[in-house]
């Protein structure tokens, strides 16, 4: 794109009252999964971040515009190895996401070459504008309804597996336990996540969890926001630590306990803002949620959703799971 074309595109947006692509977008990515795209205008350039199904929110490689079309690029590195496993060459494959806008909706196409150099993939998908965040709620004025116990300590009544993976969940001595056993010499077996049959809007949630060494799980609020549950005791703070909103919000302090000890969560979700108290320490204080996290059931932040706990990684234990809905 020439400087003249870029200037013309910028002028066109200015004449229309600003660039309509700027903001946050809930994506329904190829295959029906949940994604997110955030576009910003910085001083002299555009920037963006993207979530593509699972994993973390990551920066894109570039964002640029040509008239009424937005182009977002991502780069994937592919290592070429010889028979001994030594890396002989690293290729960078660029994926282009091309977007057209109509009101509050995006029509997108992703284009990328195959890693073997033969052919081009072209897949269409959609996005919907996420409305601006409301003001930070005054939690002192929020009213909660009666508490409901989600786990009865006896069986899995009120819960069900997500998808068709194997079930590692059971109840042992009043504890909700996940044991994703892998048999030596056999192919890896995929285990499922467990969700409530009921769905919720905003709420306060309290529970206890106990981790073993290296354990990794997560608590999904409304099925879309993951509160990280992981063995991170003694690790430097980042947005993947115990109690973080996965890849989005870093705890303000480390409050996790060593493995083997019961740990408490007190989580409040109101008006797309979240507060997390871990082991009595407020580590996230009424912070905004810009969009879903990796592993979300869908990208829509306004749809009621279940509580779900992650069981597809490692073993984990939960107990005393209690929810109080917000009364509007």
Which sequence ranges carry the predicted segments?
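Bacterial N-terminal signal peptides
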Residues: 1-9
């Amino acid at each position: 794109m020439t400087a003249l074309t870029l200037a013309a595109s910028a002028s066109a947006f200015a004449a229309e009252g600003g660039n309509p692509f700027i903001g946050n977008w809930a994506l329904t990515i190829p295959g029906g999964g949940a994604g997110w795209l955030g576009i910003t205008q910085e001083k002299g350039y555009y920037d963006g971040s993207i979530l593509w199904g699972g994993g973390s929110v990551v920066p894109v490689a570039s964002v640029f515009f040509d008239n009424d079309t937005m182009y977002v690029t991502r780069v994937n590195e592919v290592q070429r190895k010889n028979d001994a496993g030594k890396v002989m060459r690293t290729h960078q494959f660029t994926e282009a996401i091309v977007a057209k806008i109509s009101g509050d909706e995006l029509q997108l196409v992703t284009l990328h070459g195959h890693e073997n150099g033969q052919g081009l993939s072209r897949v269409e998908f959609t996005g919907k504008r996420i409305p601006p965040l409301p003001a930070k709620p005054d939690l002192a004025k929020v009213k909660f309804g009666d508490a409901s116990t989600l786990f009865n300590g006896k069986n899995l009544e009120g819960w069900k597996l997500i998808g068709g993976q194997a079930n590692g969940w059971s109840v042992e001595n009043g504890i909700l336990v996940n044991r994703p056993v892998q048999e030596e010499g056999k192919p890896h077996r995929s285990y499922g996540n467990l969700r409530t049959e009921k769905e919720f809007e905003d709420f306060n949630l309290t529970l206890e969890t106990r981790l073993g060494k290296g354990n990794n799980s997560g608590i999904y609020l409304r099925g879309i926001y993951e509160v990280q549950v992981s063995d991170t005791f003694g690790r430097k703070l980042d947005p993947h630590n115990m109690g973080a909103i996965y890849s989005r919000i870093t705890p303000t302090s480390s409050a996790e306990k060593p493995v083997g000890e019961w740990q408490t969560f007190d989580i409040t979700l109101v008006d797309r803002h979240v507060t997390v108290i871990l082991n009595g320490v407020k580590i996230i204080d009424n912070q905004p949620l810009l969009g879903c996290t990796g592993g979300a059931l869908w990208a829509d932040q306004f749809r009621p959703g279940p509580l779900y706990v992650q069981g597809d990684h490692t073993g984990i234990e939960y107990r005393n799971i209690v929810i109080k809905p917000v009364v509007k």
